[in-house]
Amino acid sequence: MFTQHPIHAIIILYFLHMQHNGGDLENMTAKLLEKHITDTIREWQVKIGYEGGTMKLYYPAESLRRSLSLDETEDLDAALAAFCKEVQPRLGTLAISAVKDRYCVEIPEEGCSYIEQKIPVPELLQNLLLVITTPGNTMEQVRDCFSSYAEKMHTTVEENASEEHEMGHVFSFSDPSVDEYCYCVEENEFGLTYHRFSREDYEAL
């Protein structure tokens, strides 16, 4: 069973402000942001299926500013516009809009199809979705899923109870290069659900 969390789609824009320091940094920034976009879209394509069309990501402006280390005098819209230009050859023309402090990034069908065709589904995500969608599974099977993957990748898994934010059990890997996300897994009478956050987003909750 899947539920969408409003913070889930927050895009990490960290380092984007460094575009002013030269082309190399700008390209590096574009790749970092592009990866977060493609990871999020690919995840939702696998979770809910994809039969064409556009997909939208929503996030609050303060999260973008925090991730960018931008102060109130720096232009968030200009930074986003520069990024859109950089990724246009792959993701198509992104449509960005804002209502007050809530931003929407719409990825066109061209970009969504590119992501579906070019971005492989991570092994961990495949394994986790199988566990989550299998009736009767519990947190113990989730724990085994992360532990098995950690052993295969020669790292360790960290598990914490997120009582403060009521996000269930939080799983992450000691080596972030294995997987840079935090997985918040909840178990109730309806089964298992999860939300995936970047580490920065989770720490900011």
Question: In which residue ranges do the predicted regions lie?
Answer:
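Short glycine-rich, basic-tinged beta-strand/loop micro-motifs
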Residues: 50-71, 124-137
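A cross-family detector of function-defining hotspots
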Residues: 147-183
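Charged low-complexity interaction tracts in eukaryotic proteins
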Residues: 88-118
